[in-house]
Amino acid sequence: MSRRCELSGKAVMSGNNVSHANRKTRRRFLPNLCQVTLISDALGRQFSLRVSAHALRSVEHNGGLDPFLLKASDAQLSSRALKLKRAIEKVQAVAA
């Protein structure tokens, strides 16, 4: 399982620890990932996703999983999230 957010694409970054003597050693910056269960109103189901805390705040800010996915670009979504987005678009197209 990769350390990558399924909704925002946020992943591991690398950098340096810098000591007081200005010595540099390599380190990794890990994203703050949480295993959460989000509910899709359009599909009427729950989905378990591994998302960053930042993406979780964005989902809440946008009014839920469905509006967030519809607004998000396809490039930053994981394959599972992209399938969810397509399913939500299909349900909304039938309802309209």
Curated annotation (Swiss-Prot):
Record's keyword annotation contains Ribosomal protein: yes
InterPro entries in the record: Ribosomal_bL28 (IPR026569), Ribosomal_bL28/bL31-like_sf (IPR034704), Ribosomal_bL28_bact-type (IPR001383), Ribosomal_bL28_sf (IPR037147)
Gene3D superfamilies: Ribosomal protein L28/L24 (2.30.170.40)
Keywords, alphabetical: Ribonucleoprotein, Ribosomal protein
Domain of life assignment: Bacteria
HAMAP family, A to Z: Ribosomal_bL28 (MF_00373)
Name this protein carries in UniProt: Large ribosomal subunit protein bL28
